[in-house]
């Protein structure tokens, strides 16, 4: 009789033979470490090449042509999600967070509340200007039928989707894209080189029909098409801050006005360790025409929601060095013959100390700095990233 296979279905037997289950768990742990190694090696290779060559366009083009490596990466990620992460998330997963933010914002009045807040602020600003400029034109109400969400499907673009986790939710009309999809429902697409077309002047149901007839590979999409764009564990994949910034800029162009950009990025450090980085990210993303809506720090990641508040972006973004503000700790890693060494962190100057002090306003304990008035933190374990996938430091 095979005690191990019986223990999987008979809890009493597993209690009588406690040694059988640890052997299985050990095997699962070894498999998880192997899959995690595949993922981390791809990221390490990309960063090494970027440090050596410096031409992120060339590096990315060669990376997208390496079909074998990309296929191994996609299958490793899907295997981790299906067989290792799913049983441990216990309701605090990144996908559930994205869904809850969308439900609160689009279906439970969140959008209307922030628009009313915007309108109130505009009235106060107008009243202040009226004291010095009696010829100032009256401000029109910002809350209109076109700026609030109408009942229907929430059009969601999941970039770097891999296995299309949002497809199971009825409230979303999901388009999942990836450079190498792990499942058939995800379309092949290189988001960095995606071409943007003029917005479609169609009713909402016609836009839904347009998305339903999409076929891969996707090389171009109309602007202002989606209510939500999701970057889940995406930005840290890229070795260059400029590539991360281009992704955020493209997301802004693809979103409708007041649409949401949801960014999830890994970080196993304690809550205040990278507060300066989160402040830097906020400034960079908001420079594109966003405003932060929510910010949550889980044990192993940052989860940030931005809403699109401006239909256009400034033409003077690169000169202000906004792209470089989307850095991650791994950008400062050095490498030797065996791979990456420990992350080097230079001593802070007095100016940086002042900036660090200011950055503590970014911590989730200060709810007033998100325009929803809500920020959260969680110390509960988030097992999905305990591998630690994507983390080098």
Swiss-Prot record:
<dbReference type="GO" id="GO:0032259">
    <property type="term" value="P:methylation"/>
</dbReference>
<dbReference type="GO" id="GO:1904047">
    <property type="term" value="F:S-adenosyl-L-methionine binding"/>
</dbReference>
<feature type="binding site">
    <location>
        <position position="94"/>
    </location>
    <ligand>
        <name>S-adenosyl-L-methionine</name>
    </ligand>
</feature>
<protein>
    <recommendedName>
        <fullName>S-adenosylmethionine sensor upstream of mTORC1</fullName>
        <ecNumber>2.1.1.-</ecNumber>
    </recommendedName>
</protein>
<comment type="similarity">
    <text>Belongs to the BMT2/SAMTOR family.</text>
</comment>
<feature type="binding site">
    <location>
        <position position="178"/>
    </location>
    <ligand>
        <name>S-adenosyl-L-methionine</name>
    </ligand>
</feature>
<feature type="region of interest" description="Disordered">
    <location>
        <begin position="1"/>
        <end position="35"/>
    </location>
</feature>
<comment type="subunit">
    <text>Interacts with the GATOR1 complex; interaction is disrupted when samtor binds S-adenosyl-L-methionine. Interacts with the KICSTOR complex; interaction is disrupted when bmt2/samtor binds S-adenosyl-L-methionine.</text>
</comment>
<keyword id="KW-0949">S-adenosyl-L-methionine</keyword>
<dbReference type="GO" id="GO:1904262">
    <property type="term" value="P:negative regulation of TORC1 signaling"/>
</dbReference>
<dbReference type="GO" id="GO:0034198">
    <property type="term" value="P:cellular response to amino acid starvation"/>
</dbReference>
<dbReference type="GO" id="GO:0008168">
    <property type="term" value="F:methyltransferase activity"/>
</dbReference>
<feature type="region of interest" description="Disordered">
    <location>
        <begin position="118"/>
        <end position="141"/>
    </location>
</feature>
<feature type="binding site">
    <location>
        <position position="190"/>
    </location>
    <ligand>
        <name>S-adenosyl-L-methionine</name>
    </ligand>
</feature>
<feature type="binding site">
    <location>
        <position position="160"/>
    </location>
    <ligand>
        <name>S-adenosyl-L-methionine</name>
    </ligand>
</feature>
<keyword id="KW-0489">Methyltransferase</keyword>
<feature type="binding site">
    <location>
        <position position="191"/>
    </location>
    <ligand>
        <name>S-adenosyl-L-methionine</name>
    </ligand>
</feature>
<comment type="function">
    <text>S-adenosyl-L-methionine-binding protein that acts as an inhibitor of mTORC1 signaling via interaction with the GATOR1 and KICSTOR complexes. Acts as a sensor of S-adenosyl-L-methionine to signal methionine sufficiency to mTORC1: in presence of methionine, binds S-adenosyl-L-methionine, leading to disrupt interaction with the GATOR1 and KICSTOR complexes and promote mTORC1 signaling. Upon methionine starvation, S-adenosyl-L-methionine levels are reduced, thereby promoting the association with GATOR1 and KICSTOR, leading to inhibit mTORC1 signaling.</text>
</comment>
<feature type="compositionally biased region" description="Low complexity">
    <location>
        <begin position="125"/>
        <end position="136"/>
    </location>
</feature>
<dbReference type="InterPro" id="IPR021867">
    <property type="entry name" value="Bmt2/SAMTOR"/>
</dbReference>
<dbReference type="GO" id="GO:1903432">
    <property type="term" value="P:regulation of TORC1 signaling"/>
</dbReference>
<feature type="region of interest" description="Disordered">
    <location>
        <begin position="362"/>
        <end position="393"/>
    </location>
</feature>
<feature type="binding site">
    <location>
        <position position="232"/>
    </location>
    <ligand>
        <name>S-adenosyl-L-methionine</name>
    </ligand>
</feature>
<dbReference type="InterPro" id="IPR029063">
    <property type="entry name" value="SAM-dependent_MTases_sf"/>
</dbReference>
<keyword id="KW-0808">Transferase</keyword>
